[in-house]
Amino acid sequence: MALTQGTKRKVCYYYDGDVGNYYYGQGHPMKPHRIRMTHNLLLNYGLYRKMEIYRPHKANAEEMTKYHSDDYIKFLRSIRPDNMSEYSKQMQRFNVGEDCPVFDGLFEFCQLSAGGSVASAVKLNKQQTDIAVNWAGGLHHAKKSEASGFCYVNDIVLAILELLKYHQRVLYIDIDIHHGDGVEEAFYTTDRVMTVSFHKYGEYFPGTGDLRDIGAGKGKYYAVNYPLRDGIDDESYEAIFKPVISKVMETFQPSAVVLQCGSDSLSGDRLGCFNLTIKGHAKCVEFVKSFNLPMLMLGGGGYTIRNVARCWTYETAVALDTEIPNELPYNDYFEYFGPDFKLHISPSNMTNQNTNEYLEKIKQRLFENLRMLPHAPGVQMQPIPEDAVQEDSGDEEEEDPEKRISIRNSDKRISCDEEFSDSEDEGEGGRKNVANFKKAKRVKTEEEKEEEEKKDEKEEEKAKEEKAEPKGVKEETKST
């Protein structure tokens, strides 16, 4: 596949001003506020002038149950901090309560995250954009009927299902430090989605993503896992990422790509143990973009929030083929970026435990697996189902789409200033990075496998039954 450097491409960006108001709770490392910080920084860099900015619709239960089970979504809709005691059994069943707490507005937060990713996929399908960006998405650990690793609804799976209506083969790439287990599991038995994950492996959450996990049934060899050790740096990462992705592109020949840009793989992340700089991380974005495929860019992990905002702002600029200065512009959160107030970060002096021999050995094993694939699976033509997001449908949503949570009314969702600081004691609480092997599920039940095979069929049937969906996303005013 030919590479073309520096081609200007149309970019659509999804953001809702309310997303930063949601709050996982005292001491929890996941802070949706980082998305507001990112948005504010890229506004002050003037990047909004170069792309179309949309406010996503709130994904409804019908959209979510294209993948998730009905009872799980019903539970997420119903549970609140004030009625938790009535749901203790279900909380256990759906893995909600510790790493994935119940917080005020939980379901709305999931609706915004999923809404942005699904709307992005529809935009790409309609060829109304070349690149779509949703930094509130990328929640790759959520399972069909279970929350996991701070993720409740798997917006990535929902977006890929949408892309599959128009694209025979979709490639998913994950550069978060944690294995993209939820996405891999959803597409483990299909040859229409290839999942490629580069992640820390061994005594680390979620405990999956072994080199030998390659997919099953029709999906055998369509799951690609690159297990890594602590301390990988820019040079080593680039030396594995580029050849693996080139080989995947050549062999799988996708017509659309989804890139999960989890920024917990950066140096100095509160939960991470890699040593990438923002430039090193963004080289992955640049390389994937160079294949000139319809591309969906999503967020994900990232727990040193000043660096998350830096990273995703820079990667938005990369998507736009725009150079931005290292000197940060003044913005609403300027004090977070001290003492240097610069965009780029330096690597630490941590040891890179990934030797060249180790990386080469893994790479060769992956290449052997990729050689087992038939070149570009055959295309099966089917009627195209309806889009999930209907633009100008004429039907109003039950809720006024312009109704917003005012900052004043949502004070209880926002923590005190110290909560958002990146202080030294941040290692306490939050997701346990030591793998819980009891929960690290690899073997699927026969029932799940059957469900997976019926997914395309079910997808088509549901689409025919669908009523008109909520009105299309609206362009956001630039003043947000």
From Swiss-Prot:
Activity regulation behaviour: Inositol tetraphosphate (1D-myo-inositol 1,4,5,6-tetrakisphosphate) may act as an intermolecular glue between HDAC1 and N-Cor repressor complex components.
Pfam families recorded: Hist_deacetyl
Active site positions, chain numbering: H141
Chief localisation class: nucleus
GO BP terms: chromatin organization; circadian regulation of gene expression; DNA methylation-dependent constitutive heterochromatin formation; embryonic digit morphogenesis; endoderm development; epidermal cell differentiation; eyelid development in camera-type eye; fungiform papilla formation
Class of enzymatic activity (EC top level): hydrolase
Domain of life according to the entry: Eukaryota
PANTHER family membership: HISTONE DEACETYLASE 1, HISTONE DEACETYLASE HDAC1-RELATED
Protein name: Histone deacetylase 1
Lineage, highest ranks first: Eukaryota, Metazoa, Chordata, Craniata, Vertebrata
Gene from which this protein is expressed: HDAC1
